[in-house]
């Protein structure tokens, strides 16, 4: 308009097709100024003088004279009585307001431009023509169908029916914005008062007034126009626009027409409403209360400051559940509040009592129907997840926040947090939040100790579950909050990691580590160990077999399971303790005297891989020096759950052995073991990777002895031992325990071997006797018959351990001792490489089992042939009887064994086992007592196996070297070590039966042949 009425309109060459000749007339402006300044008579005189017609209607003249606002006379001119002749009426020169535009504090849906599609317009007339519904009924229907927002722009609003629909929509959580013409607002206010409703008390309704443009005269007097727009905007998707005003007369008397608009054109109405709302103002009737709230310069919900206005307090108290709704859907606008730092995320106090355990006290709900609201968890964080207009609880409005702010006058705005237990007015009125303001920072353990334990009904209540709310994760945390009952299950992993990190940072490399007694703090007796071991039975089965350990790659063992966890791996130079003290659960206090052991029975390094030890001490400077200097001290370095103290055996240990039978993890009695270890604080999980013993001591009784295969095959020439120690001390620790894979490899090359488990009967005493007789017949064979029997077919003994499953056949080392013998004397480097390669996965170990035996094992068999004498027949019978005692065989196992014929068919025929020397009386008593024992298929879940091993088992391995080695592999029940050293360098691929073999091992125990 300005461009058309100025110089641009004088140039004919710039005219376009849209050019319209300007209609501006200067005498119009002068006539209006005369009317404003001097009245109606002066106006008419001016028109006569200028010889122009009257251009103002009588209604307009009356409106101007009624609404004109003149400035005071004393300020009309300056002090020098000069007038600003350059001033203008101002209608052509828009002024920018210095007042901040009001916010759509209830929120406003965001509509992506261009996504509403093409515009569609329907025309409605009043009275109705082709439509069934009238304009008023259509308006009511649109308000009922609203889900997010209802925006009304109206000149006059006095229709009671439409007003009731709006109030009811606000109680459903729909945001309602009403813009009324300022000059007609008094009519609307009168209507609401007649209906008994205080509109300013409604929490989800915002009512503001809009006036038209200001007309400024030359002298400074002004008047403003009216807002004559009339449209209804619902959810920013549908608009009703027309001449229909919300009055009774428009329904009954006036003719009107409206348009129902959807599509792209709605975006323009959206923009227009927000423009009108920005220029709107608080009605004069509400100005007093609004001025009190806005006095600090910021909105109440921005700074949390409340001025304690009596009227505002009444407003807050009177609005509680005035139109309470049952379904709580709506939430505050997250972008608005998060941008102002009002409700920061509760990351710092997410473990506090009020977030998880705290429940609000019951407060009677006097003004509304929703009493269950006080007992429901908060949906506060839904505000950050869901759209701000998916629904809102009607309490969360600035009117509600008025009273809530009274409790936070001393708090900074940024720290103001709503409690996550309840958002109701009642919870805020009781002042419960004030006690939560200055709580000092606490650790999680302290908060957990102070946490109010919720009952089962509160934890599992499904009264109301939102799809996106926080009550889901709160319920999840409550149901899984660690308690005294499930602390073992819930904190094992975290404590294990903490213990590992603490050991890595505080313990020197050669430290003994925490004692196993410390790790078992709280387990006072074997019964307690057995009871607590039930939690971790499932971890036993897979951890021993599938997780090999090397000194180069140490693993952390579970204190309760004894299993090895390969996920925590230390390097060779790490601070993790390298050895586990040779103390057991049943072991009495250790003495200062070393065990007297003849030096002639000490093992060479070449024979040490045959030791079926669960753990092997590796402290090279100490354990090996004991071997060279004082051979009698060696057995202290060997773990007591595998070695045999034949000097100090008592029949008292038999009960404990039977009690702890069929469990393959080491148990320790902390009350009886207190070695020098500095990191006892890591008693729950300390690295059980071969803790080193500074001073081996002689135990009075060694109780936890595994079945016959848990013996020390550690006797050979003293010269070889010294030679190996001098040449390759680092590899000694790597070769002290033989892997299950090595045993499989040893027996893999005998293709004619078949299992005899299918011949065995069910688990009964007669069956055990039958199996014992067959063993006696096999053991009593002469070496010549043994050779002939090995050529045809020999039974393979399946051995079972609760931790893992392994099929091992008998005596395969003896078939090829000479082939690998030349490799032994000159292969310390090969031994080191093979042991270093043993940290590979079990898959590689099983692939390597198929082709050839380990040269180290074969060479050991050859060397032992030169040393050990042959046993006597009596010794064979006794050792066989003792071996049967620890040989459970079940019908279920037989079925599984038949399924594994493919594996066993690849095994070589077994050598005849060689019996062990004569047992002592107490050992014989143990053998007989355990021989009568009937095994149950459920024993792995009830007991910890510690089968009795006679003291002569140590001697067994020294008497007849050529046969003992094979019998050790083939007939002895052995405990698989959780830290097995796989000699993968000597193995080759073994892939066909890998999946079946793995499943077989996980179902049953560890099959290692027992030694007689």
Swiss-Prot record:
SUPFAM superfamilies: Phospholipase D/nuclease. InterPro entries: FAM83, SACK1. Keywords: Cytoplasm, Membrane, Phosphoprotein, Proto-oncogene. Phosphorylated by CSNK1A1. It is found in: Cytoplasm; Membrane. It comes from the Eukaryota. This is Protein FAM83B.
């Amino acid at each position: 308009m300005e461009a058309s009425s100025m110089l641009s309109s004088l140039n004919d060459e710039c005219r376009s097709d849209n050019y319209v000749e300007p209609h501006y007339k200067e005498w119009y402006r002068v006539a209006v100024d005369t009317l404003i300044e001097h009245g109606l008579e002066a106006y008419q005189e001016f028109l006569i003088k200028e010889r122009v017609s009257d251009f103002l209607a009588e209604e307009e003249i009356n409106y101007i004279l009624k609404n004109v606002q003149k400035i005071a006379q004393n300020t009309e001119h300056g002090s020098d009585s000069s007038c600003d002749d350059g001033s203008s009426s101002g209608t052509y020169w828009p002024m920018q307001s210095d007042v901040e535009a009001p916010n759509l504090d209830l929120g406003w849906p965001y509509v992506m431009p261009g996504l509403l599609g093409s515009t569609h317009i329907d025309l409605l007339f009043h009275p109705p023509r082709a439509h069934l519904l009238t304009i008023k009924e259509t308006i009511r229907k649109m308000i009922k169908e609203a889900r997010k927002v209802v925006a009304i722009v109206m000149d006059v609003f006095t229709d009671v029916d439409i007003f009731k629909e709006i109030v009811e929509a606000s109680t459903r959580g729909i945001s309602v914005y009403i813009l009324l013409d300022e000059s007609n607002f008094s009519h609307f206010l009168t209507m609401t008062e007649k209906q008994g409703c205080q509109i300013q008390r409604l929490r989800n309704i915002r009512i503001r007034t809009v006036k038209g443009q200001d007309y400024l005269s030359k002298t400074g007097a002004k008047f403003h126009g009216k807002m004559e727009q009339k449209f209804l905007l619902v959810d920013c998707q549908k608009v009703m626009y027309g001449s229909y005003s919300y009055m009774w007369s428009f329904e009954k008397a006036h003719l009107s027409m409206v348009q129902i608009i959807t599509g792209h054109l709605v975006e323009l109405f959206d923009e227009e409403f927000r423009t009108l709302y920005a220029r709107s103002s608080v009605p004069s009737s509400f100005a007093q209360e609004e001025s009190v709230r806005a006095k600090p310069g910021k909105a109440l919900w921005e700074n949390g400051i409340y001025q304690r206005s009596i009227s505002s307090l009444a407003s807050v108290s009177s609005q509680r559940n005035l139109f309470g709704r049952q379904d709580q859907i709506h939430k505050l606008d997250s972008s608005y509040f998060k941008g102002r730092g009002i409700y920061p995320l509760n990351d710092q106090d997410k473990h506090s009592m009020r977030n998880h355990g705290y429940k609000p006290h019951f407060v009677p709900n006097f003004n509304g129907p929703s009493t269950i609201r006080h007992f429901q968890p908060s949906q506060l964080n839904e505000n950050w997840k869901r759209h701000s207009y998916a629904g809102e609880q009607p309490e969360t409005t600035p009117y509600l926040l008025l009273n809530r702010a009274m409790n936070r006058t001393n708090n900074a705005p940024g720290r103001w947090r709503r409690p996550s237990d309840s958002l109701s007015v009642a919870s805020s009125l009781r002042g419960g939040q004030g006690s939560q303001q200055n709580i000092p920072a606490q650790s999680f353990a302290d908060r957990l100790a102070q946490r109010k334990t919720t009952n089962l009904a509160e934890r599992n209540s499904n009264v109301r579950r939102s799809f996106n709310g926080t009550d889901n994760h709160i319920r999840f945390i409550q149901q899984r909050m660690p308690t005294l009952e499930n602390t073992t299950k819930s904190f094992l992993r975290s404590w294990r990691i903490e213990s590992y990190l603490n050991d890595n940072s505080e313990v020197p490399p050669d430290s003994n580590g925490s004692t196993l007694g410390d790790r078992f703090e709280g387990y006072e007796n074997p019964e307690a160990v057995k009871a607590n071991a039930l939690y971790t039975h499932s971890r036993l089965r897979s951890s021993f077999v599938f997780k090999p350990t090397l000194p180069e790659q140490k693993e952390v063992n579970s204190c309760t399971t004894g299993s090895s966890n390969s996920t925590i791996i230390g390097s060779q130079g790490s601070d993790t303790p390298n050895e586990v003290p040779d103390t057991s659960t049943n072991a009495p206090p250790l003495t200062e005297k070393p065990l007297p052991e003849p030096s002639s029975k000490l093992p060479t390094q070449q024979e040490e891989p045959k030791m079926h030890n669960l753990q092997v001490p590796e402290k090279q400077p100490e354990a090996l020096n004991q071997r060279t200097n004082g051979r009698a001290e060696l057995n202290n370095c060997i773990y007591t759950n595998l070695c045999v103290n034949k000097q100090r055996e008592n029949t008292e240990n038999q009960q404990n052995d039977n009690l702890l039978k069929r469990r393959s993890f080491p148990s320790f009695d902390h009350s009886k073991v207190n070695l020098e270890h500095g990191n006892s604080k890591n008693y729950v999980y300390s690295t059980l990777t071969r803790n080193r013993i500074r001073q081996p001591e002689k135990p009075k009784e060694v109780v936890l002895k595994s079945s016959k295969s848990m013996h020390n095959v550690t006797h050979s020439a003293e010269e070889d031992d010294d030679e190996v120690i001098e040449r390759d001390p680092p590899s000694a620790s790597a070769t002290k325990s033989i892997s299950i894979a090595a045993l499989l490899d040893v027996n893999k090359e005998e293709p004619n071997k078949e299992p005899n488990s299918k011949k065995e009967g069910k688990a009964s005493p007669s069956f055990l006797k039958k199996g014992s007789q067959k063993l006696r017949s096999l053991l009593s064979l002469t070496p010549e018959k043994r050779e002939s029997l090995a050529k045809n077919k020999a039974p393979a003994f399946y051995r079972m351990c609760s931790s893992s499953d392994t099929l091992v056949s008998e005596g395969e080392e003896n078939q090829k001792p000479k082939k690998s013998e030349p490799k032994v004397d000159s292969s310390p480097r090969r031994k080191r490489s093979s042991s270093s390669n043993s940290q590979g996965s079990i898959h590689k170990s099983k692939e390597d089992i198929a082709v050839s035996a380990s040269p180290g094992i074969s060479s050991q068999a050859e060397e032992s042939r030169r040393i050990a004498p042959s046993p006597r027949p009596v010794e064979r019978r006794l050792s066989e009887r003792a071996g049967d005692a620890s040989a459970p065989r079940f019908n279920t196992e037989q079925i599984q064994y038949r399924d594994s014929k493919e594996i066993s068919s690849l095994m070589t025929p077994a050598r005849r086992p060689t019996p062990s020397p004569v047992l002592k009386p107490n050992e014989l008593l143990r053998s007989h007592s355990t021989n009568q024992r009937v095994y149950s298929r459920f024993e792995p879940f009830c007991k910890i196996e510690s089968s009795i091993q006679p003291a002569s088992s140590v001697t067994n391995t020294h008497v007849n070297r050529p046969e003992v080695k094979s019998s050790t592999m083939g007939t002895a029940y052995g405990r698989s070590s959780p830290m097995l050293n796989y000699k993968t360098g000597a193995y080759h691929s073994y892939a066909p039966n890998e999946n079946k073999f793995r499943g077989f091992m996980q179902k049953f125990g560890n099959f290692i042949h027992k030694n007689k």
